[in-house]
Structures are given as C-alpha cells and as structure tokens.
A protein has these predicted regions:
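Extracytoplasmic/peripheral linker and loop segments enriched in polar/acidic and small residues
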Residues: 24, 372, 384-387, 414-423, ...
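Tryptophan-rich aromatic "cage" segments
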Residues: 49-52, 243-246, 255, 535-546, ...
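Gly/Pro-rich hinge or "lid" segments in bacterial periplasmic/extracellular proteins
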Residues: 77-83, 156, 181-183, 192-193, ...
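Structural transition elements
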Residues: 391-435, 456-463, 570-573
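Extracellular/periplasmic solute-recognition and catalytic clefts
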Residues: 149-163, 169, 252-280, 289, ...
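Aromatic- and charge-enriched surface segment that lines or borders ligand/interaction sites
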Residues: 57, 95-165, 196, 303, ...
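Ligand/substrate-recognition segments at binding pockets and active sites
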Residues: 272-276, 292, 433-511, 598-601
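N-terminal lobe/hinge region of extracytoplasmic solute-binding protein
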Residues: 32-101, 243-250
C-alpha cells in the first residue's frame, strides 16, 4: 500500500463539524452502569478534576469528562475510528482555528451564548475561562497536590501524565508553572469570544492537546472575580465534587453548590460519593450548539460493586453495561448463545501497540535481513491465541501489523500486514544476511546464540514466549529470556541503553491523543533514549558518539530524523498521511520492531440499549453521550 502525501502544510485540517446528532424518538431514560470495585475507585480526590495528571489508559473519568461534563475548544464525536471518531472537530470553538503564516499563533473564535450549568446558568463561557482552566492545570502541577489517577484501571506507556508535556510550547507556560509569573502571556484574550494562543515553536498537533481535559473552561469566582482559578480556587486537592459543568450533563446536586462561599465551607455535589456517581441533564446545554454529542439519555448512574454482582445485574437487566468491562467468562458465555451474542460489542483499542523491539546496535540485529527474518518467523496468530488463553480480562489482544496505533493514523493502515508468518521466507531473509555463512537460512554466527531478551512477567509470558522460542530457533536464533515482574525495574532496564538488551519482548505504547507525533518523535529519535516511559529501545537515530560511550561495537544505526521532521512540518490530514508513510518505511526498510498486538475491547450491554457506540478518541470506553435506550424500557 503506497500513500502519497497530499494536502497543505498550512491548513489546520480537521472537520468543521459533523451533522448535528439527530435526537431520536428513543431518547430519554436512565442509564445504569457498574464499576468493578477491583479495578476502579471513586474515592480518589482527583476524580473528575480536569487538571489531574492525564493518562488516557488509566483514567476512567477522561471519557466522563469528554462525553458529559466539560467542553473544550476542540473535541471528538465519541464514535469509533472508522466512523470518524478520532477526527478533531470544533466544540466550544465555532470553527477550526486560524493559524498565522509562521504557525506560531493559533486563533480560536468561541461560540457565543454558551452558558454553564446551574448554579451559574447566567454565566456565559468566554475565552478568559479557557485561559483560567489552563493556568489552573499549570498551577496544580506546580503544587503537586493533585496527583491521583482519576480511577486507575491499568498501567500504560505513552508520554502522558504531566500536562507540561503538552503545554510547554505555549509561550510563558513553563515560567507560570514554576511560579515565576502570574499569568501565561501566550494565552491572549483578544475579546470575550476570541482566544489567541502564541507558541514558542511550531506545534502542528496543538489542536489535539487542547482537546484534553486540562484545557476545560472554569468560570470566574462570583465572590472574588480576581481569584486566579475562579470557582476552582481553593480546591487544589480535587475540583471534581465542586465542578461547574459546561457539557450536556452535570453531577447531581451541583445546582446546590455555593461557589460564592469560601472553598473550605462549600458543600460537595451529592451525586458523587465513594460508591456512586450520578449525572443529570444540564438545563443550560442546548443541543443546537453542540454538533458532537447526542446526549440521548436523561440520567446516568454509576455504582461501584464487585465484579460478580455487576455481572449478575447485567444478566438480570438491572445493569446496562459494566463500564470497566465484563470478565472473559461472561463475554464467552454471551457469544456462545445465539440470542445473547448480538449484545456483545467487540473492537480494538486503537490507542495502543504492543511490540518487540530489536536493538539495532546489537548483533545480529544490526543486519536488516535478520530483522526481517525475525518478523517473518513470528507466528502472530499463535501468540495471540496463547496470550488470550492465559489472560483473565475480557479485553484480550488482537493483531497489529504496523508501528502506530490505528487511531493515530485514521485507519490508513488498519489492514496492513507487511510480514505475515512465513517460515520459508524467514529462512530466505536470513540467508541474505551477513550472519548465515553457508546460506542455508539458519544463522551460524555465535551472536545468534543465547540472545538476551527482556520480558515482563504478568503471568501469560511463560506460555506466549514459547512462540518466540520455537519460531526463532528455526532460523538459528536462541533466546535467553529474563522476565522481570517488577514494572519499575523492567522500565528502568528498558530505558538504560548500557544494558544492551538485544530484544525487548514486553514493550508497549499508549498514545496520548489520536495523532502519531509523540510516538514517532519519542520512539525513533535519540530524544527517546532514557527518561521516557518505554522510550527508544531500538536505538534508531542514535549517533556514533553515544554508541561508543555506551560500549557498543556498532558505529552507526539507521536514522529517520529527517523523515520525522518532515512529518512534523505538516498539519491536519497531510500530517496523518505522512505518519502512515513513515510507518511503512520503518516496517519495510528499517524494521526496528516486530509489531505484536493491540488491545481488544469486548463490552456486554443490556437488551434495552439500542445504541452502544465505543469512543476510540480517548482510548476505548462506551460513549455515554451516544448510547440510547429503547423507549418504554426505563
């Protein structure tokens, strides 16, 4: 599949807006959701705080904020990648931003007449509120009092967590975050409905960054309009229970909040407790001003319970879906029953990639023919079957045949499989290498024996690694696999180039947002060596001085810095196509990885749910603003 670059590097791209969601006759009712107590907690003080550290795979509330409680300048529809769900669209903004010729200034025009939820229903959302939200995100990060995860589900790769990762490119952001200034000069309020964002460097994925929860607007404090963080002032340990919504829903009881009182004396929204969360319709929200969200149901109720209790409720119809996911046993039971099978929704987590990294500075992997041979010798379908057999969650894993998660490339390479399992072709590639002297397809060099392979140790690996051992033995490579149960230790070893790990079997990456810029600029440049969570294990782009300093005998490795810089110079869909082309180049000419898998999603829904889309723009969750209930079933 060859992709030709198209489009202009000076256009923001994105979609102006989809067709407005048509409110069907089946709209209304209460959506009943379960949260498995084993995986999720509502006791974290940072729950529903837009400024809390952002980890797309960790935070269940990222979806709740997007779908229901806050609006941002740009956002997403809550649909699957294939349905355009990962395309940026205007939300608070009336259109996609205008960019200056040097692309260092992005100007957003906000929609007029948008108001906050009660008790501030008379307060219009303005550009100053967006500035206030970003400044609070920077300030909270400085004080480090908001440090939770918004309800932890699992760990992740990616570069998420610190918002400075995303917003440091805004002029003056870092100085403000360090407490050196009292404002961010790069955030210019031109007027109530116009915001100009001034950057220190060209950042063509800024739109995705401003769609994150940390840029959500915060209204001014009616008691003290000069309060730097508005109604969130004084709530450094967690703003969620006091949040004034801008989306189609609000927390039950939020209309009784008293933002004019001192923060310490303010009552919490009664709809957020340690065991439950209830969202109700925001009467200030107007469907005609929101082209992204269907917001069909009137009320959404979450309850924390044991997994077994949640699954019984789903079977009995008292629970509509388990937001944190059903067990493998429940999914398999439904799939085995022809009447129940249609109630299972399956799909891929288009945000993640699991891969094996080959170190291009360690023989025999300094030879591209060996790296191609390894890809061809890897029996992907068998590895996936074994892994899923020994994984307890219903999500499981599915195949991925290229580098970047599909959501970051708008599905351009979804069906790409550069190296299907082919033992004969693997031997042919090995025979072309400098490590097969007699050209019989089997490596006969000592470097192919006892190859150091690092692996995680979550439980399934001792079974799945047999696929690697069997496949590589046939081309003359034997592995010395070291499994590390401690995640911190595994990460420390992965990030240290002096460990000379030849193959890293447990590498994993989760995108921060549906754009591949972070992945390529981290995992395939020297900037990704050390200090990054799951960085550049393959050492692509490392210079000769570093290779010598780290004790490698190899003096050069492939470099794609120029290709990455070219892609970074594009914007919108032109950049997306460029990433897809670079993905293909890496897989065919550089071959630093064996792409192994993406995570899969399996969701069971009640019979009365007649719409059950999956949001793939912020990882993968049921899209609560797009779910609908059959009329008369409440």
């Amino acid at each position: 599949m060859a992709l030709a670059l198209s489009g202009t590097a000076c256009s923001m791209g994105g979609s102006e807006s989809p067709a407005s969601p048509t409110r069907p006759a089946l709209a209304g009712g209460t959506l009943h959701l379960a949260l498995a107590a084993k995986y999720v907690t509502l006791q974290d003080p940072t729950i529903l705080d837009p400024a809390a550290p952002y980890e797309p795979f960790d935070r269940i509330d990222a979806e709740i904020l997007r779908c229901c409680l806050v609006r941002t300048l740009l956002s997403y529809t809550g649909l699957a990648t294939e349905d355009g769900g990962t395309e940026l669209r205007p939300d608070l903004a009336s259109a996609m931003p205008a960019l200056s010729q040097d692309r260092l200034t992005w100007t957003f025009r906000l929609k007029e007449g948008l108001h906050y939820a009660p008790p501030l229903e008379e307060t219009e959302i303005t550009a100053a509120d967006v500035v206030r939200g970003i400044e609070r995100t920077a300030g909270i990060e400085r004080t480090a009092t908001v440090s939770g995860s918004g309800g932890t589900v699992s760990g992740s790769g990616g570069s998420g967590g610190s918002y400075s990762t995303y917003y440091s490119v805004i002029r003056g952001y870092d100085s403000f975050a360090r407490g050196e200034t009292d404002s961010i000069p790069g955030l210019e309020v031109v007027n109530d409905h116009t915001l100009a964002v001034h950057l220190t460097e060209v950042t063509n994925d800024l739109g995705y960054r401003l769609a994150l929860p940390g840029s959500a607007p915060i209204p001014a404090d009616p008691r003290d309009p000069s309060a730097p963080y508005g109604v969130a002032d004084g709530h450094d340990e967690g703003y969620g229970p006091y949040l004034i919504a801008s989306g189609p829903y609000m927390i039950q009881g939020a209309d009784l909040l008293e933002p004019s009182m001192a923060a310490s004396a303010q009552p919490r929204s009664r709809g957020l407790t340690k065991r439950s969360l209830t969202l109700v319709r925001n009467p200030s929200w107007d469907r005609s001003t929101d082209e992204l969200r269907g917001a069909y149901v009137e009320r959404i109720e979450f309850r924390v319970m044991k997994q077994a209790e949640a699954e019984r409720g789903l079977d009995q119809g008292t629970i509509d879906t388990i937001f944190s996911g059903s067990s493998t046993k429940q999914v398999e039971r439904y799939l085995a029953d022809p009447e129940l099978a249609p109630r299972v929704t399956r799909g891929t987590v288009d945000f993640s990639v699991g891969y094996t990294a080959m170190n291009l500075a360690v023989p025999p992997f300094d030879d591209v023919h060996v790296r191609r041979a390894v890809n061809l010798a890897y029996e992907a379908n068998r590895w996936i079957r074994v892994t899923n057999r020994h994984t307890s969650t219903a999500s499981g894993v599915g195949p991925l045949g290229h580098v970047a998660p599909d959501a970051t490339e708008e599905d351009l390479l979804r069906h790409e499989r550069v190296y299907p399992f082919n033992p004969a072709a693997a031997k042919a590639e090995m025979a072309r290498s400098s490590y097969d002297e007699n050209r019989d397809g089997i490596c006969d060099d000592p470097s192919c024996k006892d190859v150091f392979a690092l692996e995680t140790n979550l439980g399934f690996e001792k079974y799945a690694d047999r696929v690697w051992v069997d496949g590589l033995r046939k081309i003359g490579i034997t592995l010395n696999i070291r499994r590390i149960a401690n995640t911190d230790k595994y990460t420390e070893m992965s990030l240290d180039p002096t460990t000379k790990i030849a193959m890293n079997l447990g590498a994993f990456w989760t995108a921060d947002y549906p754009n591949a810029s972070n992945l390529f600029a981290t995992l395939f440049t020297s900037n990704g060596i050390g200090g990054q969570f799951y960085g550049n294990e393959s050492l692509v782009g490392v210079g000769p001085d570093d290779l010598h300093r780290w004790g490698y005998g190899v003096t050069s490795v492939p470099n794609v810095d120029a290709e990455i810089d070219q892609c970074l110079s594009f914007i919108g869909f032109a950049q997306t196509r460029c990433w897809a082309e670079l993905d293909q180049l890496l897989m065919t000419r550089i071959v630093p990885w064996v792409p192994q898998c993406t995570l899969e999603y399996s969701g069971v829904r009640s019979e009365r749910l007649v719409r059950f889309p999956i949001d793939q723009a912020l990882d993968v969750w049921p899209a609560l603003d797009q779910i609908a209930i059959a009329p008369g079933s409440d």
